[in-house]
């Protein structure tokens, strides 16, 4: 059964299965250290090359690669991930990522061209979370004050991909 990173504190000492994407990988002589993330957080994985047979394949993974990991959740005070890490028993690679076309330091125009990649960076995600929290707060306040929320159609001055064929709206004697 799948476990989320945020649930690991209740699963110390148990064998867990996580579905993660790779953040970073450090490959040492006898061990590999992976920071993997899911929608709820980041966790450190410790892979013993003696124990896991596909450690050579794991060493080729790039940021964004998807995998399923099974292992024991243990307390680790030296871990950067809330004092918990996973001692890996098995790791199944689901999808290998390609080299990302941008970095966090890329020019803004290039980052907008690859916006779907840019949104994977923590700073960009944080900005979206802050915006979301602000909008939720505004919405809750206004609803508590008995305002009525409604949504209006968007009217634009140019033809859109498909909506412009539905109907025309006369506006200042223009169609």
Short names for language-model regions:
Residues 3-175:
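Class II aminoacyl-tRNA synthetase-like tRNA-binding/catalytic domains
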